[in-house]
Amino acid sequence: MSTKLQNQRRGGRSGLISGMKFEEMFRVKHGGHKPDRRLDLWNEKKTEPKTDSINPGGDRYSVKNPKTPSTEIQVQVCSVERFCRRFGIVGSLRESFDMFFGSHKDLLGMSTYKNNPENFKRVCESVWGIDTKNLSPKWEIRRCRLTADNVRGVENITEWFQNNIEEVTRFVLTESFNNTDNIETIANKMAWTTTKNDLDSVRVFDIEEIVKEVGSLKCYIKDSRTVFKVGLLDLQMKGSGKGSHYHNMQFNCSYNQIKQLLNDEGSRI
């Protein structure tokens, strides 16, 4: 295993542990508690609540502790399969998602998710009908996905996100795959630190206020051609982890982006 990959994994584990510790500090300070994991919206398997702390007043907080106010952090990760099932995405649009995220079933195995050029070219040519001669060795062949310029029907992805921007934002920030009948798992507030690990720096936003405002924002493909701007959110292929996790959808945003959208620094608790 390369030193770079080892460092990425250590960083990911360290960030997760740090985040969990801060969430517990938040709960202790405000007398909150974390809800239990409940069955998902299909009643098939338990899923992680979007709520990190239910405070005594009943508000349900999603707690974020970024390095700086401008740091974009992960706010939702999921497989293309579950996302498309949740939103009823099928047919040629689903195929476009699979091209962009590299989520075709033959690209999700431990030996095929990355650095398997022959298998990736086979999927491109025999499944998708994509000519592989001019694909980028670094950004496409190595990573077993297509960038936006080579995704057939990519404009339909952008259009779909534009037409569903409020529902997608609500999914990312408040619901995930939780059953909305289990209200304790559904976040209604976001609590962001403006100084890392500083409980006194926390600013709070109402998520429905965010959802109301994103309807005025545009969806487009960013200059890198590997990221969709979905209103407030940046959406990319995860690009880390092993197997199918490497090709997950990862949504990111920052405190400053929300502050700018609402023209509001957020309230204190």
Can you annotate each of these PLM segments?
Residues 2-59, 64-269:
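Short, positively charged
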